[in-house]
């Protein structure tokens, strides 16, 4: 988070950007009061006009801590506490943010256009891995939220709502240490990792950026799920 804030600060200080266009803020998305506070700040910063809300956060790790399963430690609240946090950040926060941002996203007059909401889901909403119950539930819930809010907010305010479903996107090198070491995004990937994808490579962050940009600019698309996974979910698998 601090690295992201530092990068945002660098962008605002460069000669080719508008200083008022960027702002970074650390927010605890499990805390509803913090969410409400930051939305008020965003409203003031952008003068009540928001083009796009992108819901992307999740409480890592995606699995239960210490390699545990959902059926372990039944006498303890540890698993349930993790569940509550992951669902709060991964599903409740996007719903609350969407609600609170409607006044900024909706059309202000006949000459203006409404903004849009883009929810980042995951192929894990449809394909499971061991011990991903909370992650899969949150990402599956995001798809339901997208469909329902696209209809509600579309009819009432012309706000478009879509979801992006990423597959394997390599983010291991998207951090401060990798930036300082000039690490390439694909470092650590094997040829087998890449060839497993019909598209010929593992996904990178820019692939999601391009999908987001496409949906922001496409004003006749709403309620849709855009899969960005290099074709993996279309493959048939057989036991070896």
Regions found by a protein language model. Name each.
Residues 128-136, 148:
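Active-site loop-to-helix junction immediately N-terminal to the catalytic Tyr of the SDR YXXXK motif
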Residues 98, 138, 146:
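Active-site helix of classical SDR
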Residues 36, 58-84, 103, 107-113, ...:
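Conserved mid-core segment of classical short-chain dehydrogenase/reductases
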Residues 122:
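Residue(s) in the substrate-gating loop at a strand-loop-helix junction
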Residues 71-95, 118, 135, 142, ...:
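Catalytic Tyr-X3-Lys loop
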Residues 201-228, 233, 239:
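C-terminal substrate-recognition "lid" of short-chain dehydrogenase/reductases
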Residues 40-44, 58, 85-111, 150-155, ...:
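Amphipathic alpha-helical dimer-interface segment in Rossmann-like NAD(P)H-dependent oxidoreductases
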Residues 114, 155-160, 222-224:
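Short, small/polar-rich loop/turn modules that mediate ligand/substrate recognition or access, typified
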């Amino acid at each position: 988070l601090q690295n992201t804030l530092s990068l945002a600060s660098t962008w605002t200080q460069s000669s080719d950007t508008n200083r008022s266009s960027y702002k970074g803020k650390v927010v605890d998305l499990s805390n509803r009061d913090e969410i409400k506070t930051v939305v008020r700040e965003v409203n003031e910063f952008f003068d009540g006009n928001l083009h796009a809300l992108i819901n992307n956060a999740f409480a890592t790790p995606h699995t239960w801590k210490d390699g545990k399963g959902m059926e372990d430690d039944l006498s303890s609240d540890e698993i349930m506490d993790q569940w509550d946090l992951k669902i709060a950040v991964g599903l409740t926060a996007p719903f609350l943010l969407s609600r609170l941002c409607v006044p900024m996203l909706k059309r202000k007059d006949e000459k203006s256009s409404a903004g849009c909401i883009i929810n980042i889901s995951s192929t894990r909403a449809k394909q499971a891995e061991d011990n991903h119950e909370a992650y899969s539930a949150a990402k599956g819930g995001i798809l339901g939220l997208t469909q329902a809010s696209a209809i509600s907010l579309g009819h009432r305010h012309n706000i478009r709502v879509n979801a992006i479903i990423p597959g394997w996107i390599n983010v291991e090198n998207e951090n401060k240490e990798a930036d300082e070491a000039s690490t390439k995004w694909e470092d650590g990937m094997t040829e087998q990792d890449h060839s497993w994808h019909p598209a010929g490579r593992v996904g990178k962050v820019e692939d999601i950026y391009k999908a987001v940009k496409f949906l922001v600019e496409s004003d006749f698309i709403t309620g849709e799920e855009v899969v960005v996974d290099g074709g993996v979910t279309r493959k048939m698998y057989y036991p070896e």
